[in-house]
Amino acid sequence: MKKTTNEIRQSFLNFFKEKEHVIVPSSSLIPENDSTLLFTNAGMNQFKEYFLGQKKKFYPRVTTVQNCLRTGGKHNDLENVGYTKRHHTFFEMLGNFSFNDYFKKEAITYAWELLTSRKWFNIDKNKLWISVYEDDEETYKIWRDIIRIPCHHIVKIGSKNNSQYDSENFWQMGETGPCGPCTEIFYNYDDSNKSNDFLKDKNESFIEIWNIVFIEFNRISKTKIVPLINKSIDTGMGLERISAVLQNVHSNYKIDIFQKLIQKISNFTEIKDLNNISLKIIADHIRSCAFLIAENILPSNEHRGYVLRRIIRRALRHGHKIGIKNNFFYKLVPSLIEIMGDSAKILRKKEKIIEETLKIEEIQFSQTLDKGLKILNAEIKKSTNKTISGKTAFYLYDTFGFPIDLTSDICSEKNIKIDFKGFNIAKEEQKKRSSIKNKFYKDYNKDIIINDTCIFEGYKKNKTKSLVKYIFIKNESVFLIYKGQTATIFLDKTSFYPESGGQIGDIGELYHKKSRFIVENTKKYGDTIGHYGKLISGKIIVNDSIYSKINHVYRNAIQLNHSATHLLHAALQKVLGKNAIQKGSLVSNTHLRFDFSYSGNINLSQIQNIENIINKKIRSNDLIKIKNLSLEEAKKKKAIALFDYKYQSSVRVVFIKDFSIELCGGTHTKRTGNIGLFKIIEQSSVSSGIKRIEAVTGQQAIDYLHIKDNDMQNISFLLKCQNSKITEKIKKIIIQVEKLEKKTDQLQKRENIYQIKKLSKKINNIKGINLLINTFTNYDQKSMKMIIDQLKKELKISIIIFINKNKNDFTVIIRVTKNLINYITALKIINIFIKKANGKGGGKKEIAEGGGMNIKKLPMILNYIKSWITIQLENIKTKNFNN
């Protein structure tokens, strides 16, 4: 009986557990402390620091099943997914690792035993072929003499392009660093194929199933390597590939987990061919999307969020392609969790969040997908040179949310190319327009570059004696400044906190003798701190000894809001769930703003619950403790950290009893009671899946409540009732207004009927075509539209133009029946009005509207329009019209 994929995964772990390996869980898809990777793409990623010698080994032998994602860079698998047998965005990598424990002989022996022994995978030995690095004679002999592989089943692979160590069988982490030869195990699907030159032939019958890397050298340069004292083993075997082998299928998409998913997707369509490319793409993409969202990545227009959005939209487009009309993608999540078995633990915890996130993204994109596809298909039909312009591709990207690779995917199916250069030019032009639009002033100080440091003493001191090291006016270094000059001053040490981590910079003053410099803002410049402000008396010279003194009241207000921000983050996670994760913040002296991930709606009851939790912590007057810990210690204490932030090995951790633990470099109040009061003043949605809360604390919160009290008093006065009766009084007023609106509507309908009868007498009949032009004065626009639409229904062949005069301008509504639009259109008529009366407007062939027309030109335009339309109608033959 064939093993299931879930059984194969567990068998691998059980085997290496018997070989005294410690089973280590899969690390996050988001690499920790590794800015070189967007996503975890190999089993060794979580052990990179051990291979580099940056960390001491924790276990000599470990084994893992690592979740991996490959969508860009060297491993750009996205465009190949579904079209090949073995490309995936998400996959599971089986691996065993040794850190200065066993080496080549044991690693090869273990691999062979697992693959071929009856107890384990029981693969026919004759179907396995081996590649080794040509200079790695030791490995070759282990395969030949110990494992007893026939020589014609072992292939030596040399370097490419005569470049030493540049080989498929020589692994390296980078241009320098740990490296070593590797040996690969291949499975031959074809019994008749006996070629020992299978790699050069690119023979599809041979599939690489396991790569064993021997990390035994340190690369010093392109041509020089030296032996490592501590040698390691790094292996990788794709779960999907080995499952295909053990289930005797020649494509990863034929294994049990994919077949179940594909079958589920096909239930949404009339397609029963499970080899359909779109079905395979959707099956692959639901896996990567679900696991990314489970890792707290949400769809957005940048960084990892945009990768997720691209994958989702690619899947949705393929759903559309195979005829799925309704939202379907999010409905696959429960089936995915059931199918994935043990590896779906993280998905089970986040099931509702994953579903909700996918549903929102699907609804949003479905609103633009059809329109975008119509435009793209029209451009493809028009294309004479088999190329879509960069401007069109960018228009689809910018207006309809089509990622460029999605447009490319559609075009490649029809052998159409994209002008990527033109796309990038259009994208850059848009960036420039945006930057010009948002640039209200030039920040000259951003160009200041100083290769120096400044000691920050502001955690403990409000005042510091300092030395002036540099002075800049705009971006130019100067030796001194005089009264009235604005500058940025750099000191050797300071008590001023620089703008950082969402907290605004301190204000205050720098002074000595008769010189006084008012600091208006403080910013970081590399490892130093700039004090921006204006000298109001005396002069300041480089190397002057001065005092730096912060505005204590200003700092204190900031500290209250910063500590309150930590309370808010913790309260949000208690009320909304652990997926409410910080995405941005602003901590100022007047208020705080907090952006966080959350895909659902937040109701008033939840807001009040959050406020109650925070104010309860404020009343408990807990001590706020700050400790400097190693990053490892902080993680053990489950301190909250920002995913994309690069932390040092030593970090500052803020503890608010057992309620909140966060990594933070900002300033805080000593006790929660100092905050006094916390009040949320605004809750909004910043973008898809990102919410924002704004709040005030202390005196600002009291002032806010006073304003609300004043508003209530004013409303009470206007309604002539007590505060407690306001809601009841407003309900009565609403009922009265609704009754009056009904009466008004009835009167308006009567007025409309009267107007229709009156206007019917003004119709001109030209060769069987009804022409009606009428001018109203300050008439209800909604009623005008109702009248014109009713007349259009009654007058089967007609052109109707309504003009509504106001004090300084006039508006125009035009309707033309469908049987006339081949001769005269509403759009053509409105364009005459726009051109001659300097107005604005637009429309379609049957319907057009405009406004802002110059009223002085109305008589002249009416005469012109009447004569122009009459001439057009005189030339029309009406015998073919359908009355």
Swiss-Prot record:
A Pfam entry, by short name: DHHA1
- Any one Gene Ontology molecular-function term assigned to this protein's record: tRNA binding
What does the cofactor section's free text say about binding? Answer: Binds 1 zinc ion per subunit.
The EC number of this protein is 6.1.1.7
Q: List, in alphabetical order, the GO biological process terms annotated in this UniProt record.
A: alanyl-tRNA aminoacylation; negative regulation of DNA-templated transcription
* Keywords of this entry: Aminoacyl-tRNA synthetase, ATP-binding, Cytoplasm, Ligase, Metal-binding, Nucleotide-binding, Protein biosynthesis, RNA-binding, tRNA-binding, Zinc
Q: Which is a Gene Ontology cellular component entry for this protein?
A: cytosol
Asked if Membrane is a keyword of the record, the answer is: no
The listed locations are: Cytoplasm
Q: Which InterPro entries match?
A: aa-tRNA-synth_II/BPL/LPL (IPR045864), Ala-tRNA-lgiase_IIc (IPR002318), Ala-tRNA-ligase_IIc_anticod-bd (IPR018162), Ala-tRNA-synth_IIc_core (IPR018165), Ala-tRNA-synth_IIc_N (IPR018164), Ala-tRNA_ligase (IPR050058), Ala_tRNA_ligase_euk/bac (IPR023033), DHHA1_dom (IPR003156)
List the catalytic activities from the record. Answer: tRNA(Ala) + L-alanine + ATP = L-alanyl-tRNA(Ala) + AMP + diphosphate
- Cofactor(s) annotated in UniProt: Zn(2+)
Q: Where does Zn(2+) bind?
A: 562, 566, 664, 668
Q: Which PROSITE patterns match?
A: AA_TRNA_LIGASE_II_ALA
Name the Gene3D superfamilies on file: 2.40.30.130, 3.10.310.40, 3.30.54.20, Bira Bifunctional Protein, Domain 2 (3.30.930.10), Threonyl-trna Synthetase, Chain A, domain 2 (3.30.980.10)
Q: What is known of its domains?
A: Consists of three domains; the N-terminal catalytic domain, the editing domain and the C-terminal C-Ala domain. The editing domain removes incorrectly charged amino acids, while the C-Ala domain, along with tRNA(Ala), serves as a bridge to cooperatively bring together the editing and aminoacylation centers thus stimulating deacylation of misacylated tRNAs.
The record's note on quaternary structure and interaction partners says: Homotetramer.
Question: What does the record give as the function of this protein?
Answer: Catalyzes the attachment of alanine to tRNA(Ala) in a two-step reaction: alanine is first activated by ATP to form Ala-AMP and then transferred to the acceptor end of tRNA(Ala). Also edits incorrectly charged Ser-tRNA(Ala) and Gly-tRNA(Ala) via its editing domain.
Stated family = Belongs to the class-II aminoacyl-tRNA synthetase family.
Q: What is this protein called?
A: Alanine--tRNA ligase
Annotated organism of origin: Buchnera aphidicola subsp. Schizaphis graminum (strain Sg)
Taxonomy of origin reads: Bacteria, Pseudomonadati, Pseudomonadota, Gammaproteobacteria, Enterobacterales
Q: Which gene is this protein's source?
A: alaS
